[in-house]
Amino acid sequence: MTSQLKRTLTKRYGVLELWEIIVIALFAAFIVILVLSVWLSFRKKSKRSNATTLPVTQSPRFTEEIKEISVDHGSSNNNGTSYQTLDEKFVEDIENGDKFSGSLEKKPLVGSHLPPSTPSTTAPSPLLGLPEVSHIGWGHWFTLRDLQLATNHFSKESIIGDGGYGVVYHGTLTNKTPVAVKKLLNNPGQADKDFRVEVEAIGHVRHKNLVRLLGYCVEGTHRMLVYEYMNNGNLEQWLHGDMIHKGHLTWEARIKVLVGTAKALAYLHEAIEPKVVHRDIKSSNILMDDNFDAKLSDFGLAKLLGADSNYVSTRVMGTFGYVAPEYANSGLLNEKSDVYSYGVVLLEAITGRYPVDYARPKEEVHMVEWLKLMVQQKQFEEVVDKELEIKPTTSELKRALLTALRCVDPDADKRPKMSQVARMLESDEYPVMPREERRRRRNQNAETHRESTDTNKDNDITTDAKI
């Protein structure tokens, strides 16, 4: 048996014996299997890497939660014709040269709390010196341990804000960079949704008047966002006394903050695709740096919309007093909703009042309605914040009031774009509406008044006849 096997294996096939051919074949098969194994392993790793990497150029998508409808430019949501009449009356007063009282005349600028602007320089990256951790297209991927160390294990002393979304902590990274860590609530599904909304809204955008999103943490059930830290408070704190230890905002500082906010919104609405509707514009969401440059923050309610589209919501989100009437009434949302909210903030900065304050007399509870009544009665000096040591000039106040009134127009289609708002506030001209539009409204109001007068006369005649 052994000798027969030996003869078989030593049998020659050409120049090689059979056993040599078998050894060569086995070796070749081993090499092929090894090469295939290495190739498959490399390919698997490559796929896994691609699955966790979001290209920077990829447009954020949120279509599964956005219902788009075409815009009907012919429609309007005019539920307050008296407001339009009031705005028109104010414009006519300006054109006729009506003056404010002498108490608003310009005075020397003293005691300003607005520090001199520092020359703009290229700031070093706040992530400089941090260890390289996995990146997902943008920003920095922080570990839970990183943020625990930064916030002293999320101590109560580190809390700088909270709300229905979660808690915001002040922290310091290992490279000494101060940050604001937004820790979303661990509600099943909701934290992931809020996280995705905010990342898609601001993760890829860059503007000097938008608070910068530095990175994030996704670990277990934890969802956290890491923002640059603004140590100069927000507009609400400055307007309503929480920053009284630093003084009061001057008129110039207020306008500077509002112009910066307008430019940030113009960028979100007009410069990127899909456009971003913030949906929660209010004074507490406008942060400030040491030079009083505005930094718009909190994109937890933001919506991404395509061109010429609205969002229809079954649940109205936002802050009472700032929400646009058409959105509150019908759930119809677009960028003009932000314009209305911005107008409320501008009036808040002018008056120093909250949009809704039930501690005030009944006719003064709603700031927008009260202000329009005051303008109608030509009590312009009464609307200016009493805390302003140096009042704005006549032209400055007119410009700001007219801009705000256009922003809070009850007809959303007649509100200006935010780029126009920024130009209005920076311009030396009054932001009046086109003459043809004013003439049309004037004729419409006159016709309405004439019809009302005729109706009253008919009623009087009927009453006399009965007597």
UniProtKB/Swiss-Prot annotation:
Q: What membrane topology term does the record carry?
A: Single-pass type I membrane protein
Which chain positions lie within coiled-coil regions? none
**PTM-bearing positions, type Phosphoserine:** S70, S284, S313
Q: Which is one GO molecular function term here?
A: protein serine/threonine kinase activity
> Where are residues bearing Phosphotyrosine located in the sequence?
Y227, Y327
Provide a GO CC annotation, any one. glyoxysome
Q: What is this protein called?
A: Probable receptor-like protein kinase At3g17420
User: What organism does the UniProt record list as the source?
Assistant: Arabidopsis thaliana (Mouse-ear cress)
